Amino acid sequence: NRESGNGRPDIVMQTVQVRKGRVIILELKIAGSIAEMEAACDRALAQIEAQHYAEPFITEGYPEVKKYALSFCKKECMVKKAE
């Protein structure tokens, strides 16, 4: 996991090819209750943007950078994608 932007995302998956490649950034959060899961996802997406995790990959030339937030509470999981 390499550092990007102003910190380090939890998980980054990227293709070897840059010009035709893609990057997926995942930020993970633990929620205290099922009711808090959506807010945890929103915090994770805000962190991705605030810390500029995608910028190094865009600068490197990756045409597609997708950003996802995942929140967990016990055995439940919620996923939100950045627009």
Model regions: which residues?
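Structural signature of nuclease core domains in nucleic-acid processing machines
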Residues: N1-E83
